[in-house]
Amino acid sequence: MRNEIGYTNNLIKIIEDSRNNALKKVNEELIKMYWKVGEYLSMESEHSSFGDAYIDSVAKEIQNAFPGIKGFTRRGLYRMKKFYETYKDDEFVTTLLTQISWSNHLAILSKAKTAEERDFYITL
């Protein structure tokens, strides 16, 4: 009986570790996607004569292409653009930023008043 419990606990640990690793990978890919979308929007809005209407149009096109997708509203796209523009010159982007959830990034971006304060929370 003891060995069975030990084996079961080992299996539970394997499953938990794999699930956690999968969630980390998904988060990493989402953050990279938000970064790329923000970069694209930042670059395009510099060259676009439409201003805010450009991002409104992009949000509608994304909603049409992916009905029901969440996070790609006008507000969400502006957040991605701000995310990119805030961190584009920082060296630690590719490693540290992908380890933090999107909701934590949004909290840091909205609450931190200085770059030093943002860096502090990111490197915790």
Regions found by a protein language model. Give the residues of each.
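Basic, low-complexity intrinsically disordered segments
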Residues: 1-124
